[in-house]
A protein has these predicted regions:
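Multi-pass alpha-helical transmembrane bundle typical of ion/small-solute transporters
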Residues: 1-234
Length: 234
């Protein structure tokens, strides 16, 4: 199905939502795939990296992949269901739909290149900025700056508190390891859900605002297969 999209350049989607649902263009597909790659290959490692590293020896990569995929699919389809086909969780409400052009699709490509070179960039700011107006762009920039500031302060305060309470040199008791592992999986799952529900807009911006069910299946497959490659490579 994916090959058919690429060869034809566009595909008619059964919908009554207007022009944005009439066709998924080649540039929409390219932008979606590049944005999905950026999220899976780069951004998701920041969220799941510690969890993966601490569980690699105990669990097969297929088990970790299945767990991460389950949360991803639950987040994706829950958002699609409760928001009337909108997988961005309403984050694109202030960015009107527009037909995707080559320069829109170039944004996630530049993002991938920059992250591969080790340059710290904001995925949301770089990808969504090419679609947003100046007013929306200014609000995005302010929210990003405030978000980074709050995250930095909160992380530092929590780190100080944790280091005061826990002694790294003291090993965890055997009877407590299971509880700590369960807590790690639960908190990582919640963090993964929170991050996905926020950053899904970076991918959804290349798709119709109301995604039909057949396209949702394709989107789900792209994510799950992409995660499989990421976990297999470690």
């Amino acid at each position: 199905a994916l090959l058919c999209f690429v060869v034809s350049g566009s595909v008619k989607l059964p919908s009554k939502k207007g022009k944005q649902m009439d066709a998924l263009t080649l540039w929409s597909l390219v932008g979606f795939l590049l944005a999905a790659y950026a999220v899976i290959a780069n951004d998701s490692v920041q969220t799941l990296g510690t969890w993966m590293a601490s569980n690699n020896e105990r669990f097969n990569y297929k088990t970790l992949w299945a767990a991460a995929s389950a949360v991803l699919l639950a987040t994706l389809w829950y958002g699609w269901t409760v928001n009337g086909g909108d997988i961005s969780y309403g984050r694109l409400n202030k960015i009107p739909w527009q037909e995707v052009q080559w320069y829109h699709a170039a944004a996630p490509l530049i993002l991938v290149a920059l992250t591969r070179m080790g340059v710290p960039v904001s995925t949301s700011f770089l990808v969504l900025s090419v679609f947003a107006s100046t007013f929306v762009l200014e609000k995005m920039l302010m929210k990003s700056m405030m978000g980074y500031a709050v995250a930095a302060v909160a992380a530092y305060v929590i780190w100080i508190g944790v280091t005061k309470l826990l002694n790294e040199a003291k090993p965890v008791k055997e009877e407590h390891k299971k509880a700590w592992r369960i807590a790690q999986w639960v908190t990582t799952g919640f963090l993964w859900f929170t991050w996905l529900s926020h950053d899904m807009a970076n991918i959804a911006v290349f798709l119709p605002r109301q995604v039909p069910w057949d396209l949702m299946i394709l989107v789900s497959l792209v994510f799950v297969v992409g995660l499989a490659f990421m976990f297999k490579e470690g």
